[in-house]
C-alpha cells in the first residue's frame, strides 16, 4: 500500500516546459520527482537537481525491501532488445535475478534512476507471453495484433457467420 507524505512544492526549482505529469515518489526514504515531458522522463530531487543512477547493490537492496525474494545477481540493461521481457519500459534498467522459497528463478526489473520495480517476470508469465504472441500472430515483438493472416481469418469468420445466419433463416436470394 502506498505511503502518504507531504511535499512543499513552493521549494522546488523546476523549469516546466512541455510537462505532461509530475509524480512524487520515494527512493530510499527520500522524496523524488518523476517529471514526464513530451521529450522524455526526468528524475529530480526536491531541489530540481537530476538524480544519479542507482548502483547494483542499491538495486539489490530495493528488491530485498519490496519483495520476499532473494536477490542473486544484477545485470544493467541500457539497450532495447526486440521481444524482451522488459519491452516498453524506460531504460536503463537493472535486471535482478532472484529466487523464491521454491527455488524458482524470477527476474525483477528495477528502474535504474527512480528505483521503482517496473516488472516482475516468472516462468508462468513467460508461458503467457508465448501464448499471447501465438494468439496475435506476432512472434517477435508481441505488440502488434494487426497481422495480415489474422485479418484474413477474421473476414472468413465474419463471412461464415453471415452465411450461417442466411442458411438458418432460409433466406432466398433469388
Model-inferred region functions:
Residues 1-174:
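Conserved histidines in hydrophobic membrane contexts and catalytic metal-binding motifs
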Amino acid at each position: 500500500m502506498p505511503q502518504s507524505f507531504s511535499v512543499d512544492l513552493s521549494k522546488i526549482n523546476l523549469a516546466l516546459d512541455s510537462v505532461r505529469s509530475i509524480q512524487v515518489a520515494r527512493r530510499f526514504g527520500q522524496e523524488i520527482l518523476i517529471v514526464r515531458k513530451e521529450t522524455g522522463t526526468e528524475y529530480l530531487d526536491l531541489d530540481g537537481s537530476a538524480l544519479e543512477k542507482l548502483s547494483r547493490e542499491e538495486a539489490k537492496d530495493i528488491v530485498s525491501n519490496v519483495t520476499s525474494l532473494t536477490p542473486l545477481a544484477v545485470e544493467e540493461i541500457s539497450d532495447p532488445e526486440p521481444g524482451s521481457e522488459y519491452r516498453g519500459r524506460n531504460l536503463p534498467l537493472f535486471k535482478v535475478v532472484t529466487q523464491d522459497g521454491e527455488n524458482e528463478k524470477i527476474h525483477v526489473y528495477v528502474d535504474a534512476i527512480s528505483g521503482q520495480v517496473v516488472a516482475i517476470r516468472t516462468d508462468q508469465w513467460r508461458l503467457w507471453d508465448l501464448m499471447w504472441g501465438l494468439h496475435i500472430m506476432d512472434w517477435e515483438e508481441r505488440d502488434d495484433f494487426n497481422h495480415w493472416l489474422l485479418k484474413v481469418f477474421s473476414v472468413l469468420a465474419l463471412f461464415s457467420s453471415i452465411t450461417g445466419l442466411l442458411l438458418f433463416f432460409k433466406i432466398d436470394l433469388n
